[in-house]
UniProtKB/Swiss-Prot annotation:
Membrane topology, as annotated: Multi-pass membrane protein
Protein name: Protoheme IX farnesyltransferase
Species of origin: Cupriavidus pinatubonensis (strain JMP 134 / LMG 1197)
Protein family per UniProt: Belongs to the UbiA prenyltransferase family. Protoheme IX farnesyltransferase subfamily.
Primary location class: membrane
GO BP: any one term: heme O biosynthetic process
PANTHER family: 4-HYDROXYBENZOATE SOLANESYLTRANSFERASE, PROTOHEME IX FARNESYLTRANSFERASE, MITOCHONDRIAL
Keyword match Protease: no
One GO CC term on file: plasma membrane
Length: 304
């Protein structure tokens, strides 16, 4: 049934635009693009050229959205079974398979063009490889096959800082890979916290998520261990000399905060605590990368 709001042409267009936007998972895309932009700024001692910042950032945004649209398409039947995702237009059938494919192709093509014109071909192909890694390797091959899907497939989700760095420098040095490693090690504890408090949903989906295949306590142990590995990874920018004491202090404080969540969950789990830990993990990554940016321009390293 068409509601009064959607019966008006303008209302229908707005509603349809929101539905298409939902396919791109805007909140996840925003975090990815934020990390990519931080990578851009870290790649240069000065200001990022505006054409790269805007054109390159938009290109990465569009290709990320294209990958998420394919993810929604592939998982539409699974999403329909889960309370968290049943509202997605791909799951409800409001946007068809053909429409989703065309939408993804348009976003992907536009993103490739923007990166070619405003950044460089290295960034274009790296971003396209990231698109394939998420949309094909992770979504189609790994996610339904192994409870370690988020670990093995996490590289594609960790690539944005390297993409941003490449857009400015036309190179991906060790410093960029340190940023990738941070997100790579952050992803498992971030996602498994969600999988724990949504495990009833995932049990209905049939996906082999770690809390379903190995149980709550094993998952909590893995969250704790990966948190420790993540904290170690966050120290690499300081050890390597790319960041100073402002970043180090931020990384240690934020890491201790993250570890407190992981340890408390391990000792006394509750779904409410896991939900808070999941939400904090997003704030954690945002603040950590913001600290990298601040430190980059106001680096404090005491003279020895």
């Amino acid at each position: 049934m068409v509601t009064a709001t959607h019966s008006h042409p303008v209302g229908r267009v707005r509603h349809l635009a929101r539905q298409y936007a939902a396919l791109t998972k805007p909140r996840v895309t925003q975090l990815a693009v934020f990390c990519a932009i931080i990578g851009m700024f870290l790649a240069t001692p000065g200001m990022v050229p505006w054409r790269v910042l805007i054109g390159g950032g938009a290109g990465i945004w569009l290709l990320a959205g294209a990958a998420f649209a394919i993810n929604c398409l592939v998982e539409q039947k699974i999403d329909a079974l889960m309370r968290r995702t049943a509202w997605r237009p791909s799951a409800t059938g409001e946007i068809t398979t053909t429409q989703t494919l065309i939408f993804s192709a348009v976003l992907g093509g536009a993103g490739m063009w923007l990166l070619h014109v405003f950044a460089n071909d290295l960034t274009m192909w790296l971003t396209f490889a990231t698109f394939l890694g998420y949309a094909v390797v992770y979504t189609i091959l790994l996610k339904p096959a192994t409870p370690q899907n988020i670990v093995i497939g996490g590289l594609s989700g960790a690539m944005p800082p390297a993409l941003g760095w490449a857009a400015v420098a036309n190179d991906v040095p060790a410093e960029a890979w340190f940023l990738v490693l941070i997100i790579f090690t952050w992803t498992p504890p971030h996602f498994w916290a969600l999988a724990l408090y949504r495990r009833a949903d995932y049990a209905k989906s049939g996906l082999p998520m770690l809390p379903i295949t190995h149980g709550e306590k094993y998952t909590l142990l893995n969250i704790l261990l990966y948190t420790l590995v993540m904290i170690a990874a966050t120290l690499l920018p300081f050890v390597y000399g790319m960041s100073g004491y402002i970043y180090l202090a931020s990384a240690l404080v934020l890491g201790a905060w993250f570890l407190k969540y992981s340890w408390t969950m391990y000792r006394n789990y509750s779904d409410q605590l896991a939900q808070r830990a999941f939400r904090f993990s997003i704030l954690y990554l945002s603040l950590l990368f913001a600290a990298l940016l601040i430190d980059h321009y106001f680096k404090f390293v005491p003279q020895i």
